[in-house]
UniProtKB/Swiss-Prot annotation:
The gene is aroE. Pathway: Metabolic intermediate biosynthesis; chorismate biosynthesis; chorismate from D-erythrose 4-phosphate and phosphoenolpyruvate: step 4/7. One of its GO terms (molecular function) is NADP binding. GO terms for biological process: amino acid biosynthetic process; aromatic amino acid family biosynthetic process; chorismate biosynthetic process; shikimate metabolic process. The keyword GTP-binding does not apply. This is Shikimate dehydrogenase (NADP(+)). Homodimer.
């Protein structure tokens, strides 16, 4: 295999130095003995389209996309999957042999796969879901929960208008709520998801009244630094099943790796340890 035929992939963002994706994909490439490279690419908004059109000419087969470019890449892509169009953002770009850009969003799939790996047999159809926050991650997760059969998805946000926007975007099974109503919704929820940055290292804590929280409610947090947030710790103390946020990052990476390197990787404890090792 010549240098020209070794597939190249990467992750684009601004900033990008914090990304765990190079560690993740690098582990898979080494583990499976595959030819390929995965690199971080610091690209600002002004240069985004030029870079994306140039990368296929340099041998790149695709890239992951992180903040702040996940929405803007949709206007650059030549084709967009239905789920990426519905969510309004893409995190995975694939470059075709004729240098076309295909955009997809695998965040929702990664979210569901993370819970199912931790809790085999789990389904969103088990009961109402409560999603905290209404940003980009929330949109992908709400879309996935609705598609997976959640009877109702309550979305609580400090700015009510943003929660209302998700109902307009994803339909009648989405129920917007004020942040102050969270304690009333917790008792009936089969699933509680924190999609905000509250509770992340360096951010303000997530302070909730969990007095009505009890099994069999499942609680998950997309934050993975720390792995056990205060929300997950307190839910565990109350006897609830909890799922940390690292697995969502790992599972959302599977489709891109499969397309770019023609191999289906496994998400397991070895991968978790490699990504967390630093």
């Amino acid at each position: 295999m010549t240098r020209d035929t070794i597939p190249l992939a990467g992750v684009i963002g601004d900033p990008i130095s914090h990304s765990l994706s190079p560690r993740l994909h690098g582990h898979w490439l080494r583990r499976y003995g595959l030819q390929g490279h995965y690199v971080p690419l610091h690209v600002n908004h002004a240069n985004l389209e030029t870079v994306l059109r140039t990368l296929p000419l340099m041998g790149f087969v695709g890239v992951n996309v992180t903040l702040p470019h996940k929405e803007h890449v949709l206007s650059i892509a030549d084709s967009v999957t239905d789920r990426a169009a519905l969510i309004g953002a893409a995190n995975t770009l694939t470059f075709t042999a004729n240098e076309q850009i295909q955009a997809d969003n695998t965040d929702g799939m990664g979210f569901l796969s993370n819970i199912r790996q931790a809790l085999p047999g789990w389904s969103a159809s088990a009961g109402p879901a409560l999603v905290l926050g209404s940003g980009g991650a929330a949109k992908a997760i709400v879309s996935a929960l609705v598609s997976d059969g959640a009877p109702v998805v309550h979305v609580a946000n400090r700015t009510r208008a943003r929660a209302d926007g998700l109902k307009e975007q994803f339909g009648a099974r989405v129920s917007p709520s004020d942040w102050t109503h969270i304690p009333d919704l917790i008792g009936d929820a089969a699933l509680i998801v924190n999609t905000t940055s509250l509770g992340m290292a360096g951010q303000s804590p997530l302070s909730l009244d969990l007095s009505r929280l009890s099994p069999p409610t499942v609680v998950t947090d997309i934050v993975y630094a720390p792995l056990q947030t205060n929300l997950l710790r307190d839910a565990s103390i109350r006897g609830c099943e909890t799922v940390d946020g690292l697995g969502m990052l790992l599972h959302q990476a599977v489709p891109g790796f499969e397309r770019w390197f023609n191999y289906t990787p496994t998400v397991d404890e070895d991968l978790r340890e490699a990504v967390l090792a630093g």
